[in-house]
Each structure stands twice: as structure tokens, then as C-alpha cells.
């Protein structure tokens, strides 16, 4: 370190060692941080760090790509800062910690933006060109904001799912999983958004309250003879009598598509006689439902659900239009409950997963499934009574017609949690459409034709082999995989990677050379992007067969885009940076860590697991880390309508990005992360304490050169050895926390270290020695030795989260050393061993600090009484026994420096466990220089205002200390 000039106290002929530092008290973060960002960019800091770690073991944190649309929000900031802290913390261990940021670029939100800006109906190629340009601009904006947060990474070479190479490799991945037999086409109910005009992934569905019409509808008896047999009543009792099996639903719009009824095989059902006619209800629901219907009634017979199997009932709209003149059979279903409603469920197989499965299990052909709702949410014009109406507008009309038919038993408004599109915030439905799926329970075939475990089995085994932070994530993801349906891979969009299949015009069958054709298309996409599929003439690949085939128009689910980045990025576009062959050979898992918000258990974590399970038979990650969502100070979700959103850009501009980083680091990310003005004020205060501690350390090291002034630990004072031993103990804890991706304990312990261990004790004691002993005395240099080691360690602890501040301090602290340029090419500091008996030393000084705390209380009480001003005006007598007495006596006259008094005497206590403190105001004169009250003030007539110690330190051989 350079020798800085020592500041000269004004008008003092007896100077003390008050030094200065270019490290300012005020961080001025909003102004200085952008300068650091530019400096890091100019000197290509990330590249320098990678070069410094060349040949080291890699640590790969694979970036879950944010969507390239709109400005970043506080949730993005949390995510990127967490990743950055982990990369830096791992890098400081000496690992080659690699971070390639990425962006998710295809999909509906960008299509919506293009429609808003340019209108609907553009040719596909034009939509794709404009979408690509739009995404590029959004990425530039987001990248600037991420870099402003102090996030280091390969910003010059990010991965983009719209890069031609990534699009091409995605097609290759599709080809691989098709070869293994995972992909099939089928009719199934999928999440469908009318506004998107497309199927949705599970991760694109959110739930919120919706008010619907709840109705109880009767399906008239059609087979009285079979019912009489089932309930064991005379046929005459039912023949010709009005009767209904009653269902309850909150989706009246599905009634026109009803094709079956479901009962639970083991539930008891009752035949209930009412003035209106006979009703069939679950026995345990009879009393409640009759109240709802306003009917009196009595149970005349009961039977099990199993006995009702295959009995048929008239459609409730049959009397209103011949188009509904059909019978609905009863099918058994274990999923039927009696918690609410009638205990009977109506089944519209086109609009419910369980309905579909039940009807298919009973032999219903795809062609027999009634599906009148079109992709825009409007009934086909051919549907009797309701054709041309949107399903939501049709609900009251359907209720009206049911009322007229005499088959409506109740109707009222009902609020329930319902599926909505996460983009449009509008209600969605299940809708049976022909889609491409990845089968969860398909037995895949390897290259030798041998079948293996299903995708579900492989994925579940992979979860068991993955480490989760926090641990509860394992069960959450396990449950999702265990219960999920087949994955709908296809979408009906324009801005997406095409499912580049050739389908036979008559049969719809895939071309027999589909895997090879996908590779041919991928080569073209690699050169020209997905636009190549639009311009491709099938004859180029199919020759004379071209007239028999047509190009598939579906695109891949965007979760397949991001979910295959382990293939297209780690093994593909960024292979040189991210791929570690040794890790791949060891267990096939390509990334050390995936880190995202808790919603990604059903999103990116989920899709990545499924694609890797299909491609390699293993997860792509060794560990998953999940963080919570940001909420305001009252625990409410961020919402523009509430007005409680917090902009990371605003915080950076007003307080500094360092405050965001410290807030993230100091918060337990495993739960919700609360943020508010009040919370940020507390973070700022915590930052100031750390910064002030750093300023003190750097100031008092500004005339210290470790190469010239280093001393062996045996020549330090005892309190210095204690402080460094305490630092070493804390470093073990800090590094253990970092290893487990725990940041808030590090921040908490660092703040305690600064405020209590350093500011509240060690530095408080040290000031006298630093300021009053001779500048080059062994006592002062010993203190600086300790401060040097403490500062080295502390700056490295801070660097992952207080990156700007650590770098600023480091360039002052490490000036002229090997790693002056940046702290991030160095490693965690190897704190020297200070004492063979470090544990005993720590225990002894722990005891002394407890005594000091008691002494401080007593001094404060006397000060409040007005008997003393500062603690230096006091003289102490301490009575103690046992180990406490031994510890106190071992310090000799140095005890007074530890207790910050002018005198401290120790005697035996009357009882061994007693600690008695007597405070007496000093009667001696005050030394002008050190402010101690001593009997020897003025002993040298040449310096009548100095104590003997200061006289010796300034003009003589200097004082001797051995403990403090």
C-alpha cells in the first residue's frame, strides 16, 4: 500500500496518528456505480476473471432466460442478483464460475406487441421479422439494467432462443425424442386460451376468482326398467312417472356438449320421491340439495353407484331441439366426490380431462366426441339453439332454455377459483383439439429397440437424485411430475420454432423419414432462422412425394424452447464455455445449478427435467434453487393497480444498486421477499455501518505496507491475535453459508462483526494504540497487521453481494499488489494461524468482553448521575474470582485500555462467582493528547499537559504493551 501523508490535527504540538483515506464516508452510489460498470465493461472484467481461473474446475449456473419483453422488474433484479452472488462466491473459491445470460425470445407476448403496433393479419414471415427485431431491442434494454445491478457475465455473447443455432438445435432435440418414441398426435382436452387462439402450457395458467352461474340440471329418466332393477323397486313405481338424475355444474356452456354422467362406484345414491317427481342424488347430499331446490321429499330406495353403471338418461335439452335427442350413459368415476352438489357429475369429454378419460375408457371414438366450441370461444353456427354465441354470453341463454324445458332445479351466481391465461388475464377452458404430445407414460425405445422406463419414471428418479434449496422443493416438483398429464408440445402460433413435420394430406400421418427431414430443416434454420421453414418448398426435400404431403403449421411450446437450452446452449452454442465433459461423463448432469422463482417448479425446472429425461435419461442439473416472490411491506403481491410496485431502476438511481444487492442478500429468499421504503431505509443504515467500518480500516492502514511492516503473530498483542482468530472463526461460518447458497446469515454475521466485534469492541479498544503510540512502533504495527488480515478477509466476504463497494475498497487496499485490478481475480483470504491455543484464546476474550459489558453498564449509570463525563474519567476496582479473575489479572495494566478507563485494579471477590465493579471519578489531571486521567500528567516540566506515556511515545523510547 502507498504511504499516505498523515493528517495534521489543527493547532496541536502533540499530534496523534490520525490518517486519511481516499475511500469516502459517503458512497455516492447512484453516481459512482455507473462508473464502475463502465470500467468493468472497458477492461472486460468477466473475461479477465475467466482467464484467471483457466484450468480450474468449472462451476456452471445455467441461466433461466427471462422473457424479452418490457423493462425488468424487482423480481428480475432478485433473480439476477442471486445468480451473480453465487457466481462470485464460487469464483472466489478458485472455481471457474461460468455465467452466460440468456433470453427467451419466441411466443405470444411478443406476437401481441407486434399486433398492437402493426395490426393483425400480417404475413407470417413479416410477423417473424418484426418479432425478431422487437426482441432484439428489448434484450438491449434489459441487458443495460442487469449490468447496472453489478451483475457480471458474458454479456457480449448471451444465448438467445431466437439465435439461428438455438432454433436449429431445438429441432434436432425434437428429432431425437421422436426417434425414441415419446412424441405422438392425439385428440385431448388441453388448456385453451381464446385470446391466444392456442393451447397453453400448465405453467401459463394462473387461477383467480370468477363469478359463474351454478346450476343443478335434471337428466330425465329414459330407462325406468333398469332404474327399478338398480334400486330394487317395482317397475310400475317408476314407469311413466317424471324423474331425473340431477347434476351440478358451474359451466352451463358445457351442457350442450354433454355425452355422459359420472357417479362414484362406492357412493350410496338415493331415489327420492318429491312433489315434482323422482330425483336421484347422492344419499349424503339429499337433505342439503332438497333445501336448495325448495322441495320436500323422502328417500324411497338406495343403491350403490356401481349399480347405476351404463343406465341411460335423456339429454336435458332434448325436448327443446331434436339436435339434442340423445341419451347420456352413466360411467363410473373414482374422482366423483360428495363434498358439494348432487354427487353426480355431467361429462362433456371435449371440455374436461377426467370427462375425456372416462369416455375414452368406455370406448368412445375421437370422431364421436362433440366439440362445438371453436378456437375463438364461439359456438359453431351449426349448434342448435346457441350457434354463433360466445360461450360466456351463452351461459344465461342456456339457463333460460333449461328453465323452459322443465329440467332446471336451481340457478345462482357462484364465485370460485378458475383458470385464466397468464398473459391476457382472461378465463380459459379445457378444449379437445388435435395436438402433438410428449407421452408421460410411453415406454421409449433406445437405438437397439429396447424399451426403458417411462418419461414419468425417469423424471421422478431424476428428482430423487437432485439436491434442492430449500429442501421442500423436491416434494413439490415430485408431486407435479407424478400427477401431470402428457405434455402438449404444439401451439398454434406464428412466432415460434416450427414443428417442422410433413403430414400426409389424406391420412395425416408423419412422413416416414421425419427424423432425417428434421435434420435437413435444421440445417436451413441454422443458416436463415425459423423463417426458412416458411419459405421452404417441400419439393426440395421430398421430391416427387411433395404433392402428397403438406407442411405442419404448429409451433413448439415456448417451454420446449427454454427447456432444451441444456441441449442447444450448454452442449451447443456455448459448449466451449459451459460444457464440462468430465461432469457429463461422471453423471450426465450438465449444470451445477438452476436457480429461479418458485413458479418454475411447473415452468423451466419442469420442462428442462422432461426434455433432459427424454434426451439423456437424467436431469440437466445437479441442484435446484428456488426463491420466493417479492411483496410489499404488508405482504401484498406487487400490483400496478394497488400502486405498490417497486422499480429496481428507481432504487438504483436514488439509492444505488448496492442497496438492492444488500437487500436481496439480507433477505431469506426461500420465502417471500418484502420490500418497501421503510425496509430499504434499514438496508441503507446497514450499508452505512459496513462502509464506516471499512473507512476506519482503510484509514488506519494507509501508512501500512505489508511487505515491510508484517510481523509474526507471536509479536502481536494478545487482543490482536484474538481479533484475527475471531475473524478466522467467522470466515469458516461465512464460507460454509456460501457453500449452501445462504446469504442472509452472511450479511447478518458481517453486520454483527462490524458493529459489535469490531466497532463495539476491538476497534474501540484499538483507537488509543493506533492514535497515540509511535507511528512505527511495534505495538502500532501489530495492530495494523491484524487490521490488514481482517480487511483482507472482510472484503472477500462482502464481494459477492456488495460488489461495487468491495471493488472500490480493494483498489485502495490492494494498490500495487498482484490483484490490484480487481478483487474478483483473487480468492478467499487464507487467514494466518495466530495461536496454537486459538480456542482458549477465544474463550478467554469472550469472558473479558462479558466483563466489559458489565463495566460499561456501571460506567453509564455513573455518567447519567453526572459524576463522570467520559469513561476515561473513571477509575475502576473490579472484584472477581475463578477464571474471570485469572483473565482480568493476566492483562495487567493493559486492562484499562480494554475497559476504556484511566485505571483498573483487580482484587479477589468475597464469593468465587461474584463480579463487583466499583467506579470512582479520577482526581488526576487529564492528558491533553490521550485524554487519560493520570497521576503522571505534567511529570515532565517541558510538557506539562502530557502524561508519562504520551511523553515517552512522542519523545522517548515509547510505551510497552503486550495485551491490548
UniProtKB/Swiss-Prot annotation:
Checking InterPro entries in the record gives: aa-tRNA-synth_I_CS (IPR001412), aa-tRNA-synth_Ia (IPR002300), Anticodon_Ile_BEm (IPR033708), Ile-tRNA-ligase (IPR002301), Ile-tRNA-ligase_type1 (IPR023585), Ile-tRNA_ligase (IPR050081), M/V/L/I-tRNA-synth_anticd-bd (IPR013155), Rossmann-like_a/b/a_fold (IPR014729)
Q: Where is this motif: 'HIGH' region?
A: 66-76
Location of the protein in the cell: Cytoplasm
Please name the CDD domains in this protein's record: Anticodon_Ia_Ile_BEm, IleRS_core
Q: What Pfam families does the record tag this protein with?
A: Anticodon_1, tRNA-synt_1, zf-FPG_IleRS
Q: How does it assemble?
A: Monomer.
How does the entry describe the domains? IleRS has two distinct active sites: one for aminoacylation and one for editing. The misactivated valine is translocated from the active site to the editing site, which sterically excludes the correctly activated isoleucine. The single editing site contains two valyl binding pockets, one specific for each substrate (Val-AMP or Val-tRNA(Ile)).
Q: What is this protein called?
A: Isoleucine--tRNA ligase
Species assigned in the record: Cupriavidus necator (strain ATCC 17699 / DSM 428 / KCTC 22496 / NCIMB 10442 / H16 / Stanier 337) (Ralstonia eutropha)
Which gene name does the record give? ileS
Amino acid at each position: 500500500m502507498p504511504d499516505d501523508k498523515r493528517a495534521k490535527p489543527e493547532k496541536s504540538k502533540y499530534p496523534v496518528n490520525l490518517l486519511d483515506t481516499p475511500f469516502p464516508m459517503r458512497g455516492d452510489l447512484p453516481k459512482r456505480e455507473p462508473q464502475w460498470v463502465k470500467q468493468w465493461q472497458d477492461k472486460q472484467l468477466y473475461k479477465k476473471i475467466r482467464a484467471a481461473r483457466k484450468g480450474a474446475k468449472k462451476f456452471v449456473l445455467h441461466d433461466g432466460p427471462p422473457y424479452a419483453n418490457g423493462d425488468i422488474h424487482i423480481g428480475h433484479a432478485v433473480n439476477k442478483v442471486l445468480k451473480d452472488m453465487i457466481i462470485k462466491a464460487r469464483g472466489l473459491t478458485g472455481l471457474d464460475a461460468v455465467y452466460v445470460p440468456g433470453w427467451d425470445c419466441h411466443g405470444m407476448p411478443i406476437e401481441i406487441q407486434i399486433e398492437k403496433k402493426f395490426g393483425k393479419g400480417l404475413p407470417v414471415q413479416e410477423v417473424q421479422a418484426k418479432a425478431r427485431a422487437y426482441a432484439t431491442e428489448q434484450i438491449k434494454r434489459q441487458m443495460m439494467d442487469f449490468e447496472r445491478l453489478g451483475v457480471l457475465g458474458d454479456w457480449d455473447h448471451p444465448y438467445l432462443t431466437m439465435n439461428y443455432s438455438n432454433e436449429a438445435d431445438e429441432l434436432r432435440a425434437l428429432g431425437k425424442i421422436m426417434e425414441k418414441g415419446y412424441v405422438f398426435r392425439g385428440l385431448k382436452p388441453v388448456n385453451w386460451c381464446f385470446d391466444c387462439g392456442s393451447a397453453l402450457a400448465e405453467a401459463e395458467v394462473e387461477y383467480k376468482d370468477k363469478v359463474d352461474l351454478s346450476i343443478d340440471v335434471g337428466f330425465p329418466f329414459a330407462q325406468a326398467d333398469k332404474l327399478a332393477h338398480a334400486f330394487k323397486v317395482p317397475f310400475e313405481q317408476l314407469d311413466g312417472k317424471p324423474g331425473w338424475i340431477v347434476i351440478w355444474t358451474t359451466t352451463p356452456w358445457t351442457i350442450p356438449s354433454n355425452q355422459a354422467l359420472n357417479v362414484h362406484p362406492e357412493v350410496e345414491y338415493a331415489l327420492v320421491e318429491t312433489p315434482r317427481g323422482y330425483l336421484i342424488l347422492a344419499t349424503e347430499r339429499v337433505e342439503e340439495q332438497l333445501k336448495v331446490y325448495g322441495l320436500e321429499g323422502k328417500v324411497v330406495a338406495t343403491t350403490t353407484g356401481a349399480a347405476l353403471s351404463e343406465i341411460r338418461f335423456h339429454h336435458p335439452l332434448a325436448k327443446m331441439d331434436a339436435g339434442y335427442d340423445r341419451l347420456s350413459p352413466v360411467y363410473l368415476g373414482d374422482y366423483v366426490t360428495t363434498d358439494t352438489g348432487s354427487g353426480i357429475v355431467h361429462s362433456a369429454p371435449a371440455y374436461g380431462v377426467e370427462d375425456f378419460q372416462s369416455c375414452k375408457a368406455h370406448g368412445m371414438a375421437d370422431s364421436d366426441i362433440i366439440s362445438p366450441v371453436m378456437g375463438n370461444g364461439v359456438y359453431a353456427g351449426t349448434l342448435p339453439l346457441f350457434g354463433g354465441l360466445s360461450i360466456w354470453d351463452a351461459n344465461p341463454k342456456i339457463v333460460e332454455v333449461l328453465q323452459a324445458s322443465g329440467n332446471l332445479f336451481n340457478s345462482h351466481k357462484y364465485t370460485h377459483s378458475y383458470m385464466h391465461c397468464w398473459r391476457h388475464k382472461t378465463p380459459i377452458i379445457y378444449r379437445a383439439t388435435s395436438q402433438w404430445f410428449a407421452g408421460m407414460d410411453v415406454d421409449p425405445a433406445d437405438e437397439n429397440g429396447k424399451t426403458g422406463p417411462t418419461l414419468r419414471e425417469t423424471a421422478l428418479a431424476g428428482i430423487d437424485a437432485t439436491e434442492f434449496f430449500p429442501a421442500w422443493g423436491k416434494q413439490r416438483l415430485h408431486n407435479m411430475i407424478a400427477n401431470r398429464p402428457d405434455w402438449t408440445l404444439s401451439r398454434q402460433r406464428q412466432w415460434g420454432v416450427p414443428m417442422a413435420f410433413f403430414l400426409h394430406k389424406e391420412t395425416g400421418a408423419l412422413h416416414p423419414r421425419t427424423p432425417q427431414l428434421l435434420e435437413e430443416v435444421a440445417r436451413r434454420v441454422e443458416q436463415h432462422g425459423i423463417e426458412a421453414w416458411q419459405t421452404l418448398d417441400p419439393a426440395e426435400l421430398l421430391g416427387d412425394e411433395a404433392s402428397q404431403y403438406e407442411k405442419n403449421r404448429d409451433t413448439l411450446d415456448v417451454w420446449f424452447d427454454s427447456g432444451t437450452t441444456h441441449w442447444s446452449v450448454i452442449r451447443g452454442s456455448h459448449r466451449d464455455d459451459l460444457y464440462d465433459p468430465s461432469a457429463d461423463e461422471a453423471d450426465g448432469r450438465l449444470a451445477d445449478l438452476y436457480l429461479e422463482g418458485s413458479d418454475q417448479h411447473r415452468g423451466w425446472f419442469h420442462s428442462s427435467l422432461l426434455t433432459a429425461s427424454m434426451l439423456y435419461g437424467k436431469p440437466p442439473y445437479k441442484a435446484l434453487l428456488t426463491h420466493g416472490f417479492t411483496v410489499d411491506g404488508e405482504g401484498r403481491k406487487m400490483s400496478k393497480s394497488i400502486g405498490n410496485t417497486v422499480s429496481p431502476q428507481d432504487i438504483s438511481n436514488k439509492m444505488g444498486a448496492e442497496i438492492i444487492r444488500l437487500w436481496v442478500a439480507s433477505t431469506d429468499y426461500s420465502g417471500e421477499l418484502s420490500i418497501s421504503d421503510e425496509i430499504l431505509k434499514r438496508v441503507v443504515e446497514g450499508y452505512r455501518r459496513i462502509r464506516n467500518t471499512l473507512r476506519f480500516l482503510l484509514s488506519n492502514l494507509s501508512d501500512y505496507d505489508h511487505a515491510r511492516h508484517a510481523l509474526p503473530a507471536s509479536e502481536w498483542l494478545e487482543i490482536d491475535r484474538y481479533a484475527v482468530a475471531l475473524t478466522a472463526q467467522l470466515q469458516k461460518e461465512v464460507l460454509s453459508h456460501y457453500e449452501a447458497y445462504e446469504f442472509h446469515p452472511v450479511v447478518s454475521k458481517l453486520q454483527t462483526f462490524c458493529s459489535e466485534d469490531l466497532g463495539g469492541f476491538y476497534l474501540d479498544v484499538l483507537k488509543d494504540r493506533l492514535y497515540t503510540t509511535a507511528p512505527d512502533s511495534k505495538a502500532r504495527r501489530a495492530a495494523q497487521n491484524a487490521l490488514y488480515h481482517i480487511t483482507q478477509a472482510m472484503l472477500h466476504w462482502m464481494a459477492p453481494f456488495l460488489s461495487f463497494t468491495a471493488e472500490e475498497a480493494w483498489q485502495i487496499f490492494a494498490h500495487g499488489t498482484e490483484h490490484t485490478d480487481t478483487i474478483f481475480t483473487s480468492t478467499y483470504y487464507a487467514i494466518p494461524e495466530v495461536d496454537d491455543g486459538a480456542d482458549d484464546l477465544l474463550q478467554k476474550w469472550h469472558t473479558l468482553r462479558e466483563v466489559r459489558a458489565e463495566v460499561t453498564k456501571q460506567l453509564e449509570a455513573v455518567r447519567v448521575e453526572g459524576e463522570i463525563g467520559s469513561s476515561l474519567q473513571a477509575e475502576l476496582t473490579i472484584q472477581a474470582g475463578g477464571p474471570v479473575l485469572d483473565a482480568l489479572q493476566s492483562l495487567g495494566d493493559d486492562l484499562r485500555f480494554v475497559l476504556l478507563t484511566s485505571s483498573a485494579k483487580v482484587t479477589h471477590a468475597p464469593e468465587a462467582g461474584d463480579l463487583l465493579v466499583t467506579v470512582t471519578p479520577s482526581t488526576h489531571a487529564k492528558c491533553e493528547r490521550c485524554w487519560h486521567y493520570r497521576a503522571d500528567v505534567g511529570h515532565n516540566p517541558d510538557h506539562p499537559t502530557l502524561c508519562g506515556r504520551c511523553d515517552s511515545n512522542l519523545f522517548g523510547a515509547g510505551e510497552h504493551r503486550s495485551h491490548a
